[in-house]
Amino acid sequence: MSTLKEKLITQIASERTIPNSKVTVVGVGQVGMACAISILGKRLGDELALVDVWEDKLKGEMMDLQHGSLFLQTHKIVADKDYAVTANSKIVVVTAGVRQQEGESRLNLVQRNVNVFKFIIPQIIKYSPDCTILVVSNPVDILTYVTWKLSGLPKHRVIGSGCNLDSARFRYLMSEKLGIHPSSCHGWILGEHGDSSVAVWSGVNVAGVSLQELNPAMGTDRDSEKWKEVHKQVVESAYEVIKLKGYTNWAIGLSVADLLETMMKNLCRVHPVSTMVKGMYGIENEVFLSLPCVLSASGLTSVINQKLKDDEVAQLRSSADTLWSIQKDLKDL
């Protein structure tokens, strides 16, 4: 006897079983779910997989998103603690890890998170050997290095979200000061995502007009307009948000979706993301820092050779030294 479905539908061909543009988010905490909803909102994949060790929350988040399927363009949303659910992912976003506490620097998080990655990364590679991994967990630059070492992937397929959000915060704060939309305020934060980041004042511009040419003291202690405070606000903003609401999630989720859009759509846009910088700007160690990078469907395909002033290069090297001082002591990688 025919079922209702068989009476309703005449099948012509078998459905494709392997997704074209599957995205996995590892970790369904505040950041992971902000990434997930931002990715869904941009219609970036034909399948979204969620994975975590917290089974009840994982199932609840999956069901909550599935119930909103009518309003989304990603028709398949799956979740499981078993990494088999992530198979055939094009991009894997890693947000898992222990949460940053109020007043805790990102670098203090490192050893607690390394052990988590020793389990996660091999599982990702087992089921999606051809994927690109985007690391979001903090401290993101060191954990991107850890991911690169554990995964065995080429460096262009291991990317850290890096200073994409720092630069967005910088441009927002510029826009508030100038009364111009952030998209028209151009500036770059490079180096470590966090306390030793570098503001490239020499490149800050609006419509091609160098702001440092208009105000040569910009970014220095001599500046009466105190532009240096803008970078200080960028560095402190995450701590401020954590103090107020307990965590950050929405801005990083939107930032991650921005990066995925560039890669999934092969847009070849330039983003300040974390990549292996050994041999660049006189940096001698294998550290990951943010530089302006071209992202495409292949991952991170090239780095823009930004002309930096001597003091900016010195700050970048100092940022590298800060990371290496911790990274060199990591074991079992």
UniProtKB/Swiss-Prot annotation:
The protein's assembly and partners: Homotetramer.
Name the family: Belongs to the LDH/MDH superfamily. LDH family.
Gene Ontology cellular-component terms listed = cytoplasm
Function according to Swiss-Prot or TrEMBL: Interconverts simultaneously and stereospecifically pyruvate and lactate with concomitant interconversion of NADH and NAD(+).
Reactions performed catalytically = (S)-lactate + NAD(+) = pyruvate + NADH + H(+)
According to its UniProt record, where is this protein located? Answer: Cytoplasm
Q: Which GO terms describe its molecular function?
A: L-lactate dehydrogenase activity
Please list the residues that bind NAD(+): 29-57, 99, 138
- Give a Pfam family name: Ldh_1_N
Q: Which residues cross the membrane?
A: none
Protein's recorded name: L-lactate dehydrogenase B chain
Example of a GO biological process term: lactate metabolic process
Q: Where is the active site?
A: 193
Quote the gene name from the UniProt entry.
Answer: LDHB
The protein's UniProt keywords, in alphabetical order, are: Cytoplasm, NAD, Oxidoreductase
Q: Where does substrate bind?
A: 106, 138, 169, 248
Please classify the protein's predominant subcellular localization into one broad category.
Answer: cytoplasm
Q: Does the keyword Ubl conjugation apply?
A: no
